[in-house]
Amino acid sequence: LGTLVLSGCASFSPDGGFDTVRETTRARIGADAQWARSDEARKEIDTRVTELLAKPLAAEDAVQVAIYNNRGLRAAFYDLGISEAEMVQAGRLPNPHFSMLRTSRAENGVREFKIEQVLTFNLFALITMPLAVEVEKRNFAQTQRMTALEVARLASETRKAYFGTIAAEESVRYLRKVRQAAEAGAGLARKMAEVGNFNRLQQAREQGFYASAALDLARAEQASIAARERLTKLLGLPSPQAIRLPERLPDLPKLPDELPAVEQTA
């Protein structure tokens, strides 16, 4: 029985099982995952986030801010701690149960007292402890993998939102120029029509082009606002104004990346 008890023991790891997630994140994403388990650690992370936000964000910086700051990811980290606690609890000895009964009765002028004390153990839980620990270890390992996967998912969504936001804002700037040109064209068409050099059809065509350009710009502005708000949420920031982005997307590479072993890797 002692062997069963010893084999079922489990204890908390110094890092709460987070090192596996951190190493996987560094290897697959190239980012630093940190779990703020104290106020001091949270302050250090906040300082790092402030430094990253002090300049226009690059794509990798945006991913790093999201990993540091995303509230959903913080919840996943705490789920990892809960999973480890369940694993450790499965390896703890079940508490014994102590009960005492005290009775008395009087008979023939004599009072008799009766005291019963019972100490019980959950023998079934004790015997099945090693199996329970093994199950919780597997659950803990699965939680580690799921947490690392959640980090990768957040990084992917952040990259998409980052480039989508820059593209949306670049489209707004382009469509503003289009609207300005269309507005100038509509104004010129109106003046030309007034002096008889444009007929009504030509004027209506220019006016329609201006109205279409204005509508396209309004839609682009709404899409830009929505894209920036989504990026703000992924980064865990309180306001879209906290983000500074480059004015344009990076140039495409002149040559495609060479991936000779991509088929074998796939």
PLM ranges: what are they?
Residues 68-75, 81-96, 107-109, 117-135, ...:
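A glycine-/polar-enriched beta->alpha junction
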Residues 59-71, 98-102:
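Glycine-/proline-rich flexible loop or hinge segments
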Residues 4, 82-83, 209-213:
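A short structural micro-motif
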Residues 1-65, 221-265:
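Terminal intrinsically disordered/low-complexity segments used for targeting and assembly
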Residues 44-55, 99-128, 132, 245-259:
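Small/polar, glycine/serine/threonine/aspartate-rich low-complexity segments that form flexible
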Residues 63, 116-118, 162:
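Membrane-embedded beta-strand positions in outer-membrane beta-barrel channels/transporters
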Residues 93, 101-105, 122, 185, ...:
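Outer-membrane beta-barrel pore domains and translocons
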Residues 129, 145-265:
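Periplasmic alpha-helical coiled-coil/stalk elements that build and connect Gram-negative outer-membrane
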